[in-house]
Amino acid sequence: LQYFKEPAPQQRIIATPGQNTHIPVWLLGSSLFSAQLAAKLGLPYSFASHFAPRMLGQAIQLYRENFEPSEYLDQPYISMGVPAVVAQTDAEAEYLATSAYQRVLGLMRGQSLKLKAPVATMDGLWSPAEKMSVDNFYAMAQIGSPDTVKAGLEMLLEKYDVDEFIFTCDIYDTDKRI
C-alpha cells in the first residue's frame, strides 16, 4: 500500500503511474485468511461469493470482529459478489442463466470457459453430481424477474448486512445482458 503514497526517501520501488493517486484499495478474497488480512489492514473487504460462496458468513463475521481502524477506513465495509441474471420473467431469466451454468460446467471439466448460447434445458448436459456442484457455485445467484431478484437481494442484505453488492452477469446475448 505504501507504493500508492508519496515515496519515502529510501524507497527503491516507485509505482508509476500510481504514486500519490490515493486510489481506494480493496481486498477481494474468498477465504477466512483474506477476511483476517483485510481486517488487520483496515481495508474494505469484498468477498468473492459470486464463485466461492461457502465461507461468506464466516468471513464476514471474522472481518467484522477483527477489524482494526486504519488511515483507509474507520469501520468495516463489506461487499459481496452476486451472480445475477435479470429478465422480464423468471422463466426467461432461467433460460438465459443456462449460459452461466454451461460455463461453470466447462470450468469443472477443464474445458473452454467461452460463454455458450443458452439452452432450453440442462438435462443431459450435466450429471446429478455436476448439477449439485454448479448449484453450490451459484448459491448466491439471483435469477429471475426484477421483482424476484429484488426480493432475493433484500434477503441477502438482511442475512449478511453488507454495504454493497458487486454483480457478475454471464448472459450470452449482449443486448439481453445490458
Segments (PLM) and residue ranges:
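An alpha-helical appendage that flanks or caps ligand/catalytic pockets
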Residues: 1-14, 54-161
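Aromatic- and glycine-enriched pocket-lining scaffold segments that form the walls
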Residues: 1-6, 10-43
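Conserved active-site loop/cleft motifs that coordinate metal ions or position small ligands
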Residues: 157, 163-170
